Amino acid sequence: MSTMIFMYFIYIVLYASGIAANLSYHVHEKRSIPVWWQRVSRIDPHAFLPLTIALAQQNLEHAEDYLLSVSDPSSPQYAQYWTAEAVAAKFAPSEPTARKVMSWLNQSGIAPAGVRRSKSGGELYMNITAQEAEKLLHTTFYIYKHQLTNKTLAICEKYSVATFVEKYVDFITTTEQFHHGLRRRSFQDPEPRMPSGKSPGHYVELADDSFPFPYLSFGSSVGLLKNKILSDSLPSNCDKLITPDCLRALYHIPVRNTSHPDNSLGIIEFTWVGYLESDLDKFFNIFQPSMVGNRPKFESIDGGFIQTLVPSFAFNGEADLDIEYAMALTHPLNITNYQVGDIWSLGNMNNFLASLDSTYCSAVDPVYDPIYPDPTPANPPLPSGYNSSDCGTHKPTKVISISYAYEEGEFSPAYERRQCLEYLKLGLQGVTVVFASGDHGTATRDGMCGNTVIDSNQISDHEPSYVPTFPSTCPYVTSVGGTQVPANGSVLDAEVAFDTIITSSDGNVSSRLTSAGGFSNVFAVPGYQATATRDYLQRLQNKYTLPVNLNVTGFGSGRGFPDVAANAAAYATAVNGKLVKVYGTSASAPVFASVIAWINDARLNMGKQPVGFVNPVLYANPQVLNDVAKGSNYDCANLPAYHASSGWDPVTGLGTPNFDRMLDLFLQLS
C-alpha cells in the first residue's frame, strides 16, 4: 500500500468513526532562545510555515545495551561493530509510530493530502499556515531576527502535542527563514566570528630566541608494540613549556615509521577557525623537520574552507594547535581536517553529524544550528553561501577529536538528548569520539555563575549553580579534562590538575583557567560510571565541605565528567608566524585522541577492530591510566569547587593516558 493511500485510509476511518478533536495536550519541548535571536513581532497568521515532525525512533530503550554489547570488555560481542545501514535500520521509526502521529494530525484537521513522509520514513512534512500551526501545537509563533546575519526566523518558545502521541514524536521544527532584508556585507566587513561554544583561546607569546631547549631529533623506529621516547635523555622544562617530546615522555606515546592504511584520526574545526600552512611548517621545522610540507587530508562540509582572510590567534590558534600536535604525535598516520560551515553561516556539531548520518538531517534546528543551503548572495571577492546541504555525504574517521565545549544550559534537553544519541550510534560503528571538557572549572565561559537549571524538559530560573559542559555530559563520548606538570617538576613527576592564571600583555586583565568538570543536569549517570562517581562522592563528603553553590539537580545522580585527562598547560604552538604558549583542554583532546589512534593502529595490524567507545573498558580498568590526585578546579567565585583525588574525580577523570598499559590491555581484548 502506498504511503498516500495509507494516509487517506487513516483519514477516512477517523472521519467515519466520528472521533472528537477535543484532545488533551502536554508541553513537549520548552526552549531558551539563544541571545543572538531578537524577537521582532508576531507572525502573520496567514503566512505559510513548513513544519517537520521527526518521528520517535524505535528501540531507544535498548540503545545503551546495544552500545555496551560492542564496547563492554566482558561482552562476547566486544568490537563486533555495526554498519551504518544496520544502525539506521535498528532505530528507524516504526509504522505504528507513523500511524499514531498521522491520526493526531487528522483529528486536528490536517488533511492527509497535505502531509508528506520522507524517503527514510523518519519525518513527516507539511506546509500549513501559522494560524493552523499555532492551533495544532498550542503555541504562539514570533518572528525573530539574528543579530549577526540579519536572517529572520519563525520561532515558538514552547509547543505541545496531544498526550496520546507524545511518545511517538521526537521533535517538531519549522524551517521557514524569511530572507527579506538580508544585508550584503562588504569585503571590509565580513563580520568574522568565533563558532558558538568556543572562546578565542588562551595564549602567551613566546619569543623564538627564548625557546628553552634545543630540538631533539627522532630516534629510529622500533617494533610495533613497544614505545621509544624521542631521545635517550628526557626533555626538560616541561613544567614551563610543553612540546611533542614532553608529551611522548609523559604518556609513553610511540614513534613509528609506518601506520596501518585503514587507520584514521579526524580533527573538527568550524568556520572561521582554520590552520595556516606556514604555521604548520614553522612548527615542524622546530620539532620535526622531516614533516615540513605535510598537510592533513581536507574534507569540506557545508562549504567548509581553510580561512586565511583574517589571520589572528582567534581564528588560527585552535586549528594550528590541534593539527600541529595531532600530526606530530601520530606521524605518519594521515590526519583528516573536517572543516564545517561556509563563510557566512559557520557550522557546528549538528551540521557535522548530519553529514555522517542522513537520518539526522531533520534534527538540524534553525534556532540553534546553521541551515544549508545558505542563500547569502556573493559579494566579491567573498563567495556566495553554500548552495547545497551535506546530508549523509561523509564517513567518520575511526577517532574524532573536538576541542569545543558548550554550556549544557545553552540548548534544550531534547536537542542535547537527540545529539547524544548520534554519538552512541558512532560508538556502535566503532568510532571513538573525544571532546575537550572546557577551561573554566564549574563556571561559564565568561567565568560567571550559572543561573539556569534544567529539569526534564522545563527550563526555569534558579539560584546560582555550577555549569556543566556539553557534549562532555553525554555519556557516549569520552570527555578529556586538563592536567599540568607541577611547578619545577619533571616528566617523571605525577601531574596535577590544570590550574593556570593568564595575564594580558598589559598586565591589566587576568583569567583563571581550570579543568571543567562536574555532573550533568540532563543525563543520568551511566552504569559503567556509577561505582566511580559514588566512590568519589563518598570521599568528597568525608574529606571536604560540599561546595556552597552546588545547586544542581545532577549532583550525585547525573553523568560525571571528564572521563580522562591530558596536559593542558603551555603548549609551544606556531600561530601567525610566532611561537606562543597555548593553554586549555583544547590541547588535551587531540593528545588523548592520538593515543587512541596508535592503539587502533596496533589492533588493526593484528587483524582486530578499533577500540570504539572506550569508556566501559577504562572504567573497568582504571589502573591503565596515571591517576591524578592533587589540585582542584574552581567556581565562579574563584574558590575551589571539586577536588582531584585517587580514583575518578570530576576534575581529571580517571587520569592521564599511559600508552604502554593501555596498549597491553586493549590488545588482550578480542
UniProtKB/Swiss-Prot annotation:
Catalysed conversion reaction: Release of an N-terminal tripeptide from a polypeptide
TM spans (from-to): none
Leader sequence residues: 1-20
Propeptide residue intervals: 21-231
Residues that hold Ca(2+) according to the record: D627, V628, G647, D649
Binding note for cofactor: Binds 1 Ca(2+) ion per subunit.
Major site of localization recorded for this protein: secreted
Enzyme class per UniProt: hydrolase
Superkingdom: Eukaryota
Limits of the Peptidase S53 domain: 241-669
GO cellular component: extracellular region
InterPro entries according to UniProt: Peptidase_S8/S53_dom, Peptidase_S8/S53_dom_sf, S53_propep, Sedolisin_dom, Tripeptidyl-peptidase_I
GO molecular function, one term: serine-type endopeptidase activity
Active site residues according to the UniProt entry: E318 (charge relay system), D322 (charge relay system), S586 (charge relay system)
E.C. number: 3.4.14.10
Compartment annotation: Secreted, Extracellular space
Listed cofactors: Ca(2+)
Gene3D superfamilies attached to this UniProt entry: Peptidase S8/S53 domain
GO biological process: proteolysis
Keywords carried by this UniProt record: Calcium, Glycoprotein, Hydrolase, Metal-binding, Protease, Secreted, Serine protease, Signal, Virulence, Zymogen
Glycosylation sites: N334, N387, N488, N508, N551
Keyword Glycoprotein attributed: yes
CDD domains for the chain: Peptidases_S53, Pro-peptidase_S53
Protein's job: Secreted tripeptidyl-peptidase which degrades proteins at acidic pHs and is involved in virulence.
Protein known as: Tripeptidyl-peptidase SED1
Organism for this UniProt entry: Arthroderma otae (strain ATCC MYA-4605 / CBS 113480)
